[in-house]
Every structure is written in C-alpha cells, then in structure tokens.
Amino acid sequence: MPVKRQITEPNGVFFITFTCHQWKSLINLTKGYNLIYNWFDHLKTKGHFINGYVIMPNHVHALIAFRNSNQPINTIIGNGKRFIAYEIIKRLKELKEDKLLHQLHLSVEAKELERNKKHEVWEDSFDWKECRTNEYMLQKLNYMHDNPCKGKWNLAAAPVDY
C-alpha cells in the first residue's frame, strides 16, 4: 500500500481519513463498524487516544492522539487497514458477495498480486492533517460529527442521532 506522505513525528494529534476502494460501501455492507471499534480499542491498549471519529458506510474519519509510538504512525494505520480489510473480505465471503469479491480482486495491481494480495478493500494510503491548535481540532470534530447529516448522506437529522 503506497503512502502519499509520511508522518515523521512519533507523537501528535492527527485527523485521519481512509476510504473504501472506489467509494464502495463495504463497511456498511459487511456491518463492519465493530471492526473499526476493535482497531480503536487496540490503539488505546498501545497508549493512543481516540479523540473523535465518524464511521461512514464507505470511509472513516478519526481524530487520534498518537503517544510514544515505537512504530511509525503510517505503519500503525496501514496495519489497522490490513486487519480491517481481512475481516471485511471474510464477511463478504460469508455473505456470498462473489461478484463484488471478483471486482475487488480485479482491482489489485500486478505487483501487489505478486505479493499475494488478493483484494483491494481500501483506496491507496490515507489522508491526514496534523492538528496543532485546539481551534483546528474543534473544526475537525465538528466536520466529523456533521458528516452523516449533510450532503448526499443525510443518515441522521442531527449528529447525536447517528
């Protein structure tokens, strides 16, 4: 999974976004919300803090405070995406979503196939922004919480309802 930009700091608060491949609603289809929660729980056991998040049908926004990490933050996020992808594929197989699994397989690049990657669950890499001020963190929290209530989603009338 190529990384667009490396996070070079071992600590900090970051607004992270990662998206399902071709914006497919894989999280919703597989009822994979608990997979994200499990990853958050894992991060907490490592001393990191989940300051806010929203799990949408096809993407995740999270405000995460990474603390004293012995791994690069990009690696932590990449490992989380791999764990979640593995479980999503497992659920798609259980749901007998053969056509979708085939599409996800066809999306894997040749060099990734050589490394035994079988399905493309996520868009490459992830987006991130470092949050250096309380005002910026509040802006990102408000954006996340409003996300399900706006635009094409309209999944809830108010953030508290989602």
Label every model-predicted segment.
Residues M1-Y162:
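Short catalytic/metal-binding and nucleic-acid-binding patches
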